[in-house]
Amino acid sequence: MFPSLQSFAKKILASQHVLPEDYYHILKRCGLWWYKAPISLDCKHMLIRLPYFADGLDLNTALMIAAKENNYQLIKLFTEWGANINYGYICANTQPTREFCWELGANYRLDKKKVMHMFFKFIENKTSQYIILCHKLFNENPFPTYVIIREIKSSLYWRLRRLVEDEDLLRDVSDDDMLTLYCFMVALQNDLREAVSYFYQHFKHLNTWWLICALCFNKLFDLHYLYEQEKIRIDINEMMRIACTKDNNFLTMYYCFILGADINMAMLAAIQFFNMDNLFFCIDLGANAFEEAKALAEQRDYYLISHRLSLDIYHPDPSLFTLKEANPKKIYHLLNNYKSKSMSAYLDYHINDTTS
């Protein structure tokens, strides 16, 4: 789009590195005011600088935000400065805004590649700011949400399906909620605390899923916050089963153990998910359902596990029974340098057996 003389003048004004506050009223009159601050343009890299994005947003991203906000003045301005109007169309969630984008040259059909490019650009940035921005741009925005969910739904669905046995819980997840869950998982796994807090605060109806994710990703302090402060409750043995879905989830498994979860059930879950470190951890915590566990292992053709369970060499680890309350700091300290005595017993047996 060929820029007007007016937009060119605004570009020069926005490119000034430092403007005294006396100029602020001029910037407001010129439409160079956004989020209670002047719009600043880095012409070398074509970045829009905002108070909550000090490192700057590229023009296409700024255009997407303006389109989501139905800000026609900025949509036109950013397009004249060089942004691709098709990116604005991605986030145009009202008919008048879509029509305005068409007037500025947007394609009538949504470009799926551009949608996925921007989505993964935000997600892979792995900062709280970008995760929150990604969610705000695409959530409750049926056109791009539909495209994104079609691309990620299959892998995400089976990822979630592994965590919960209640299929009704999955069936009730809307496309918007699935997108929210995906963004939350990225934030939680990468310890993006600002983004995690954002989801906790704004999406209370997904609290059960927040608890499930904390269990699965071994996030002890999040689990304690959700369980004790938010009072989110599901069956304690189901909590333990979810914690057992990933290997080395000792922190969340121990938390469930202290709350009273059946450690023999956890032993069977460790076999079900073929997680050997979890299995030895359960034995250290006193699990003794060896016959049932062997039968399950043989049923699944896990003969190496069955052999390990047939050995009469295991004993609980007394050091793991010192805590009586689910205190996350104490649990973290207790398990910080944890080494499985049961695994050591098996390795010693295996070494002696092969050398004799």
UniProtKB/Swiss-Prot annotation:
Give me the ANK repeat coordinates as residue ranges.
Answer: 58-90
Could you list this entry's UniProt keywords, alphabetically sorted.
ANK repeat, Glycoprotein, Host membrane, Membrane, Transmembrane, Transmembrane helix
Question: Glycosylation annotated at which residues?
Answer: N125, N352
For this protein, the parts annotated as crossing the membrane are 206-228, 249-271
Gene Ontology cellular-component terms for this entry are:
host cell membrane; membrane
* Secreted keyword on record: no
Belongs to which family?
Answer: Belongs to the asfivirus MGF 360 family.
Please give the function described in this protein's UniProt entry. Plays a role in virus cell tropism, and may be required for efficient virus replication in macrophages.
Q: What is this protein called?
A: Protein MGF 360-10L
Species of the source: African swine fever virus (isolate Pig/Kenya/KEN-50/1950) (ASFV)
